[in-house]
Amino acid sequence: MLVHTYSAMERPDGLGAAAGGTRLSSLPQAAYGPAPPLCHTPAASATADYHPPYFPPPYPQAPLPYGQGPDATAAFPHLAADPYGGLAPLAQPQPPQAAWAAPRAAARAHDEPPGLLAPPARALGLDPRRDYAAAVPRLLHSLADGAHGLADAPLGLPGLAEPPGLEELQAIDDPGMSLLDQSVIKKVPIPSKAGSLSTLALSKDSLVGGISNPSEVFCSVPGRLSLLSSTSKYKVTVGEVQRRLSPPECLNASLLGGVLRRAKSKNGGRCLRERLEKIGLNLPAGRRKAANVTLLTSLVEGEAVHLARDFGYVCETEFPAKAAAEYLCRQHADPGELHSRKSMLLAAKQICKEFADLMAQDRSPLGNSRPALILEPGVQSCLTHFSLITHGFGGPAICAALTAFQNYLLESLKGLEKMFLSGAGGGHGESKASEKDTKHRK
C-alpha cells in the first residue's frame, strides 16, 4: 500500500501556506458577493429599540454579601479578572455598541438609584435587569412578616416605590379578601400616598365600595298591577338595584332585566352588566339566584309599598269584622260557654296585642332609609330578611292583617256583652211572671 505524503511546500499549485492569503486576495471580486456581516446591524430607525444580548457569567456566581467600597477588589481577588474576557473577540465586530454605550450608561446612572442590587451589578460589570418592576409583587408576598420593619428604610429597587398596578395585584392575591368576593359592590383600591412598604400592606379597610349615590335614580319602571287607564311609573334607585343583587334574593341578569322591564335581546345581559359597572355594581355572568321566584319578585319596592298601603286601607275599612263576630257568637250561644268563651277572647286579644306591638317596633330598611334599631339584632335581622324578600310589603301587610283580627276580637267581646245583658234581662222577667202566677193562684 502506497502512502503519498505532501508537505506544504510540495503542493501542486506551487503555493505555500504563507501564500494562501495572497491567493485569496488575488481572486476576482466579481465572482463573489460581499461577505455577510458577522452580527446583526440594526437599521437606523430601530437603533433606539435594540438592546444587545445578555450573556450570563461563565460560572455560577453566588450573591455577594458586601457593598460597594474601595477595598472590594482586595478582599475578593477573583473579581479582578473580567469574567467576560473570553467573549471580547465577539464584541469586536459590533461597532453599533460603541454608540449605544454612552446613552445607556447615562440612562442607567439616572434611573438606577443606589440600593441592594446595584453594587453587585457594577462590581461584575453586568447590565442591571430591567424586569425588577415585574418581580416586585412576588417579592412583596414574601415580606408578609418583615414589611413593617423595612417600611422606614426605602429600598433602592427600581419601580418599588410605586409599581404600576400593584394595588390591583394585592387586592386579587390577598387571601384575606376572599370573604368580600360575594359582594356586588365593585371594589376600588385606595391610591397609596407614600412609597413605603407599609402603605402596600392591604387590608379590608383599604377597599371601599365604588357604588355611586344610592339615592340616584337608575331607571323608571311601569307598574305591574296598575290599570292601563292609570299607568304609574316607579323610580328605581341605585340602592334598590344593589339590594336586589344582594342576599337574600341575589338576582341574576335575566331576572333583574325582567324586574326592570328590559326587553330581551341578544346582548341584553352584557349591556346590563356594563351599565351596572358604570355605577359601581358587579353582576358576574352565569350567576344563580338564591331565593325562589314569587309574584312579589316582579314588584319593585315602590309598587310593593304602594300595594301594602292599599291593602292596609282595605283591611281597616272594608273587612267585615262585625259580621264575622256576630256569626261566630251565634254558633256558641250556650249560656254555659259564655264565660269560658269570654276568657278565651280576652287571652287572644292580649296575645294579638303583644305581636302587634312587636311588629310595630320593626325597623327594617324601607327604601334608602336606615331607622334606628329598637329590637334586638337577632330578631331584627330576621324581620329585615322578610322585608327584603317581600320588598317592603310583608311587614305592613301583617300589621294590616293584625288590625283586622283585633277588630274581630273587639266585635266578639261586644257580642258576648250583649248576650250577657239579654240573658240577665230574660231571667228577671221570668221571675216576675212566676210571682204573678203565685199571687193569682192564692
Swiss-Prot record:
A motif (PPxY motif) lies at residues 54-59. It is found in: Nucleus. Pfam families: TF_AP-2 (PF03299). InterPro entries: TF_AP2, TF_AP2_C. Keywords: Activator, DNA-binding, Nucleus, Phosphoprotein, Transcription, Transcription regulation. One of its GO terms (biological process) is positive regulation of transcription by RNA polymerase II. Residues 287-417 are annotated as: H-S-H (helix-span-helix), dimerization. The modification Phosphoserine is found at residue 246. One of its GO terms (molecular function) is RNA polymerase II cis-regulatory region sequence-specific DNA binding. GO terms for cellular component: nucleus. Transmembrane segments: none annotated. Its main location: nucleus. Sequence-specific DNA-binding protein that interacts with inducible viral and cellular enhancer elements to regulate transcription of selected genes. AP-2 factors bind to the consensus sequence 5'-GCCNNNGGC-3' and activate genes involved in a large spectrum of important biological functions including proper eye, face, body wall, limb and neural tube development. They also suppress a number of genes including MCAM/MUC18, C/EBP alpha and MYC. AP-2-epsilon may play a role in the development of the CNS and in cartilage differentiation. Binds DNA as a dimer. Can form homodimers or heterodimers with other AP-2 family members. Belongs to the AP-2 family. This is Transcription factor AP-2-epsilon. The lineage of its organism: Eukaryota, Metazoa, Chordata, Craniata, Vertebrata.
